[in-house]
Amino acid sequence: MKTGLLLPAWSYAVEGATLSACALLAFADRAVDAGFASLWVSDHFLNEPYVDYAAMDIQFPDEYRGIKSGQWECWSLMAALAARTTDVTLGTLVTNTAFRNPALLARIIDTVDDISGGRLVVGLGAGDFATEHHAFGYDFERPIARFEEALSIIRPLLRGETLTHQGEFYRTQGASLLPKSVRADGPPIMIGLLRGGPRMLRLVAQYADQWNCMLPFADSHVASYIAAWQQVSAACEKHGRDPATLARNVTVGVCLNDNYPLPGALPLRGSHQQLIDACLAYHEQGVETLSMVVEPCTEASLEVLAPVLEAL
């Protein structure tokens, strides 16, 4: 089982401090040195945790009222990481298809995959927070319908097809990705989903090469994953896909202090051996990649986790 780290690219992410983009890239180097086999970047512009997370049934305390958080732009970081690293897998966890025209996004993805030498996993999602969509002028109505149409454009373009599309939200006319990246079929597509409805489950079965189970906001122990996988597996069978063809990627919260920032969540905690055992429980369930949201996300924490990563 491979391990990964979600890089702390957002405001106040490192014990209340915000890393510059250059400092974040240097931190990525330290993560690779510690033994992480993959690096991940989320895709947000701006959110107001007290308001936005409430829509996800996560209630921050009153002192968070009015506080806003942003993030360095995802694909700028991905391009820099692709040029800076040599061996590790790079992925988005996940990129919001509503933020960029899907044909343009496919062109960006293909370019970054080529820069990386074919090490990219492209995680795609429909978007989470109304605040950032409205702030930056994007519609947030009918996000699943938009997401499905975006997938119907991104996937064939990444696979090398020429595409003419006249849809409800997007249009292309003879679009193709030229020149094409080092992988003729493009990078694997991963769709992130924990508690999706029937439509999102169908999209995982129909479009995804990998599925990500995002647990840092919930219970990061393996029982949560098992319940979610049962839903995804059943959806694959319902829509005529062998579940064994869907690679599995899980993101967990790992807390090395008493200050995990997400209210109500249950991250992995404990000694080195307790963390190793909790992670290996995922390997026993067939998970290929276990990525982590680490608190505090510091160089000292990377040193603490190095023996855990070596054991996995």
Which residues make up each language-model segment?
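Active-site-adjacent structural elements that line small-molecule/cofactor binding pockets in enzymes
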Residues: 1-312
